[in-house]
């Protein structure tokens, strides 16, 4: 069977960047990585209803900078910034350095694979038919300017005895093209029949489009002067 590699991991360094940007000595690397994982788990747990798309972690000299991409920044900030202050203190205890938090708004959540996958998972938990949820998500994403969308759901769909996989695609999703800007994410829906996995691929266009070949200049005919 053909297996598909993670489109985001395959494009790191080409069209995508790392979500953790820092340097550490060999003896400190494992501790720093563990801190990053703990911070991400903490943020995902605390900001479950804030539509968080991506979390970037940077470590300048003796402090940390965390960039949270969210479709609902007001939920994270809270009244008069109270929520974000408490969050900053909690993260500082985990990372043991001063932390600066920046929130960036996701203006088009329909073009974000993580938010689309979580939205479908929430609909499945509310017992919405999986085909209706997939088609509605695909139409909304294409309406916002995506060139192609593919959605796959796996599990006991509709309460069936045997688990299966269903997928729906519109447009083109060129997974083999490295310059293609493809966003990919997964989510899980916890239903009464078990867990249903959701995968979303969104093709937004080509980042490094090939330059059109210059047309060969036609040889210019020069008129010789008649003596």
Swiss-Prot record:
Any one Gene Ontology molecular-function term assigned to this protein's record: mRNA binding
Pfam family membership, one: Ribosomal_S3_C
InterPro entries with a match to the protein in the record: KH_dom, KH_dom-like_a/b, KH_dom_type_2, KH_sf_prok-type, Ribosomal_S3_C_sf, Ribosomal_uS3_bac-typ, Ribosomal_uS3_C, Ribosomal_uS3_CS
Top-rank taxon, per record: Bacteria
SMART domains per the UniProt record, alphabetical: KH
The keyword Ribosomal protein is annotated on this UniProt entry: yes
Domain KH type-2: 39-107
Any GO BP: translation
Keywords: Ribonucleoprotein, Ribosomal protein, RNA-binding, rRNA-binding
GO CC, any one term: cytosolic small ribosomal subunit
HAMAP family per the UniProt record, alphabetical: Ribosomal_uS3_B
Family statement drawn from the similarity comment of this UniProt entry: Belongs to the universal ribosomal protein uS3 family.
Oligomeric and partner information: Part of the 30S ribosomal subunit. Forms a tight complex with proteins S10 and S14.
Protein function: Binds the lower part of the 30S subunit head. Binds mRNA in the 70S ribosome, positioning it for translation.
Protein name (record): Small ribosomal subunit protein uS3
Organism, scientific name: Coxiella burnetii (strain Dugway 5J108-111)
